[in-house]
Amino acid sequence: KGYILKTQANPGYLDIVELNYFNLEKIENLLEECSICINLIGILFEKKKNLFKKIHTDFPDLLSKLSAKKNIEKLIHLSSLGIEESKDSKYAISKLEGENKVKKNFERSVILKPSIVYSVDDNFTTNFMTLLNRLPFMPLYYEGKTKFAPIHVTDLVEIIFNIVEGQSNEKTIECIGPEIISFKEIILKLLKAIDKKRLLIPIPLFVAKM
């Protein structure tokens, strides 16, 4: 995906660097060349060695320590909205711990807490569309009543741009869109988009917590 971005930038404006995100020497060298670091690394599902704790907690801990060591101007860290209430979710726990590590390690950090970020080909929409295409039913945890305020990726980029340009002094920013929508409503919109009908099975709160 990074190489697609390069085709949309002026020649010499964007450099794509491939690296293991726990390669300390390479990260330190990259931080030497920048004044602002933006951490957008995250996963929705664990797979093989890509574990929530490793990606959402350990890496932000490392990056924020190196950012402090290199005395960069600002570290912008993408966390997630509502993770404080999700005490039974490995995803949420790892995100919150990573956020706290960044705050502790680097005082000039800015924490962005977006709701669902959507765009063409985003992971959230693509993953659920794939599931809806393959499965004859869709479980609705917490009965599908969980509320979201999805934000379009261009609006999130504008927030980041304003921070980079020094137009915001907030330390933590909740990033939400104009519409509040339930998880069930999101699934219904996706079903309409792919022209499918599926059995939606509400999973009550006490069952989801088991």
Task: Locate each region found by the language model.
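Mid/C-terminal beta-alpha module of Rossmann-like enzyme folds, strongest
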Residues: 163-210
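Flexible, glycine-rich beta-alpha linker
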Residues: 87-90, 110-131, 146-147, 181-182, ...
